[in-house]
Amino acid sequence: MDNFMLTQQQIDDICEDLDGPLNFLWGYIRDAYGIHPHQLDPASFEERKKDFLFLIGKLMDEGRLKLAKNDEFMTGSTEEQVEMFRKSFPASDEEMELGCWFFFDECPAGAVWVFKGERENGEDYYEWT
């Protein structure tokens, strides 16, 4: 599994039907690597982390994801917000605690999915997780 990276098709598949908290996105990446939910895979952790950070940046740049904490949107550029995640991200599957880290105070933000023009009046719909 060394140097495995998501293919464009896997990225497209993951990005197609996103919703739910960020641990879902982490789980989709884990699944793409063929790793079972309770399996620890230190060899691929850094690559999965890079893929996760890449995907949240991509989704933010596309306007499909905003990050928020305590009911307030995070401020700063996409790069600054991704860097905030990079700095606080766990160093291993063990520290990730089966995806529970995304619900701990140490996690800098949660997902707010943006559905463009989905409200009755044509405004964007925000799904807070």
Where are these regions (language model features)?
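Generic detector of bulky aromatic hydrophobic side chains
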Residues: F24-I35, E47-R48, F52, L65-L67, ...
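Short, amphipathic alpha-helical interaction segments positioned at domain boundaries
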Residues: M74-T129
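Alpha-helical DNA-recognition elements
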Residues: K58
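A short, conserved structural fragment
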Residues: D61-D71
